């Protein structure tokens, strides 16, 4: 099959799940490329806004050809920016067809706005399209608010959902989570995101006996990630005399303001490269994530894939709650989170290999690639 991936956002603003799925499909013998048009924000990254290329170009990344373009967003002009973004994606698709031919299927990541662009392309070229949805209500509500009937965006995105040949939420809970915006009158099938289980392979840990227990957290500094719960929970743990340390990594976790809230035993590492994240996991005994809203946090899968248990909150989807490897605490429960950390410290953990194998069966590139392949073939038959 000839598959074109279109992400709603991509490097330098994340979106690596698109690349991972493209690699998984290419490994199965398919022709796969990525069409990436990224809107840059002057308030998000001044350097990127001015220095990234102003022209369209192609480049290779981990064996995948990426047709790349950047758009400078105009502050407070959401409607203008969206129309321009979709128009450029349509133009890039035309260029793509002239060079590589018409793809058999379009795989858009997130309805806002790759899914909407895919719908418009599908109407012109009569190509089936699939939307994999990654965004939870908490992230969408920042722009849409709690009154979807008053926003111009929601009807457009809802139409993209309803016209899609299939919507693929990365967790089953996501369907209900975003139903206030998109309803449920569309075809959907759950397929997990993928992680590189060979890269995040299982590795035995040394015994915790006679040394400090090592927690880690890999998450950007944002309200959604719950650092205002995790930090006091860890402080409470230390006040009980527990010998533990917590190392934090993620964007904006190395700012002066963030570090001023850290207590004894907590180290902030800032944003890390993928190899550094893996090293941090291998040096840790458990990962903690006190999130308020998640769809499918890949760092939990990555941690369990390396063989360590995780502690998170009730916003985590059921498919991540691997028995013996994932402890769940209510959202915003400082005392409960601290108690869970203490329990993990005191309970010997010997299930690392079993949990790693379960993650591989659900989220390895081969497992996810085969599920996507089967879905795409069924839509084309």
Locations of regions flagged by a protein language model:
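Carbohydrate-associated surface elements
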Residues: 173, 194
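Nucleotide-activated donor-binding/catalytic signature segment of Leloir-type glycosyltransferases, i.e.
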Residues: 256-275
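Short hydrophobic beta-strand element within catalytic cores of glycosyltransferases
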Residues: 309-312
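Conserved acidic donor-binding segment of nucleotide-sugar-dependent glycosyltransferases
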Residues: 326-334, 342-349
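N-terminal subdomain of nucleotide-sugar transferases
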Residues: 1-60, 238
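Conserved donor-binding/catalytic core segment of Leloir-type glycosyltransferases
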Residues: 4, 168, 207-225, 231-235
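Nucleotide-sugar donor phosphate/pyrophosphate-binding loop at the beta->alpha transition
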Residues: 127-130, 138-159, 197
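Aromatic "clamp/platform" in nucleotide-sugar-dependent glycosyltransferases that forms part
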Residues: 292
């Amino acid at each position: 099959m000839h598959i074109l991936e279109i992400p709603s956002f991509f490097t330098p603003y994340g979106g690596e799940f698109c690349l991972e799925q493209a690699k998984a499909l290419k490994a199965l013998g398919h022709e796969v490329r990525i069409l990436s048009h990224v809107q840059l924000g002057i308030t998000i990254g001044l350097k990127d806004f001015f220095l990234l290329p102003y022209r369209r170009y192609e480049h290779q990344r981990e064996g995948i050809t990426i047709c790349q373009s950047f758009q400078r967003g105009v502050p407070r002009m959401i409607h203008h920016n969206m129309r321009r973004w979709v128009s450029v994606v349509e133009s890039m698709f035309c260029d793509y067809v002239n060079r590589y031919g018409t793809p058999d299927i379009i795989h858009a990541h997130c309805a806002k706005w790759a899914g909407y662009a895919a719908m418009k392309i599908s109407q012109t070229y009569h190509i089936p399209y699939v939307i994999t949805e990654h965004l939870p209500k908490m992230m969408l509500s920042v722009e849409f608010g709690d009154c979807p009937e008053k926003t111009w965006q929601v009807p457009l995105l809802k139409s993209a959902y309803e016209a899609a040949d299939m919507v693929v939420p990365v967790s089953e809970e996501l369907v209900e989570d975003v139903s206030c915006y998109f309803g449920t009158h569309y075809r959907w099938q759950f397929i997990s995101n993928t992680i590189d289980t060979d890269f995040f392979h299982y590795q035995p840990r040394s015994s915790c006996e006679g040394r400090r227990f090592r927690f880690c957290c890999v998450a950007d500094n944002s309200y959604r990630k719950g650092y205002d719960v995790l930090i006091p929970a860890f402080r409470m743990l230390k006040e009980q005399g527990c010998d533990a340390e917590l190392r934090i990594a993620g964007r904006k976790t190395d700012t002066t303001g963030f570090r001023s809230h850290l207590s004894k035993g907590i180290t902030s590492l800032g944003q890390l490269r993928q190899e550094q994240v893996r090293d941090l996991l291998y040096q840790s005994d458990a990962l903690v994530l006190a999130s308020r809203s998640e769809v499918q946090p890949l760092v939990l899968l990555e941690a369990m894939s390396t063989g360590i248990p995780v502690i998170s909150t009730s916003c985590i989807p059921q498919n991540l709650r691997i028995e013996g490897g994932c402890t769940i605490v209510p959202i915003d429960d400082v005392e409960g989170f601290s108690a869970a950390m203490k329990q993990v410290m005191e309970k010997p953990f010997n299930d690392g290999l079993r949990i790693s194998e379960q993650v591989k069966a659900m989220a390895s590139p081969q497992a996810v690639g085969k599920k996507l392949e089967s879905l795409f073939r069924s839509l084309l038959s």
